[in-house]
């Protein structure tokens, strides 16, 4: 047994970027000051993959770019020493990006997602939340831990978030069912 008990401290930054291209300097600032283990970005709004470039070479970047429509998009950036691997991704309607990391022999799935808008039809919402449930179930069936970070466009309501000023809407109700 080693005389040093070393533990890995995992830190996560998650944010709706509302367009990352003009904010890369801010992203570099976050990376250099906070040194997060994981960064989950929603609504990157890049038109092609490979546009999210940062000064640090310590990160592996996984992206989901919308193919048919503008907006949206996801990026999950992971420190390379966590041995990240791509697991799965959704599409323009189910914006989900799943990456697996490894810490001290433990597998952890990072689910990064961007939920449907309040005005989207119910079919799209059901498809999205079903996909989230599938990803969670698959991880659980394989005894893999989960980190779930998203912009769910929720309006979660007070039942989920104490003092939420919004009344619960459809996405909030779907999240409540998921929990």
Language model regions located:
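A shared catalytic/ligand-binding motif for oxyanion handling
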Residues: 1-179
């Amino acid at each position: 047994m080693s005389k040093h008990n070393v533990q890995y401290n995992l830190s996560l930054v998650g944010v709706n970027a509302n367009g990352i291209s003009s904010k890369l300097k801010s992203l570099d600032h976050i990376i250099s000051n906070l040194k997060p283990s994981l960064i989950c970005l929603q609504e990157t709004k890049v038109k092609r993959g490979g546009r999210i470039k940062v000064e640090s070479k310590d990160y592996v970047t996984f992206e989901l770019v919308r193919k048919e429509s503008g907006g949206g998009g996801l990026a999950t950036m992971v420190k390379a020493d966590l041995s990240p691997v791509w697991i799965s991704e959704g599409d323009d309607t189910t914006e989900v990006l799943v990456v697996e990391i490894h810490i001290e022999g433990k597998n952890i799935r990072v689910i990064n997602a961007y939920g449907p808008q309040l005005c989207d039809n119910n079919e799209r919402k059901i498809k999205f939340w079903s996909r989230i449930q599938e990803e969670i179930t698959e991880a659980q069936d394989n005894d893999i831990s989960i980190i779930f970070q998203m912009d769910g466009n929720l309006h979660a309501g007070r039942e989920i978030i104490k003092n939420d000023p919004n009344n619960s809407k459809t996405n909030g109700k779907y999240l409540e069912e998921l929990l």
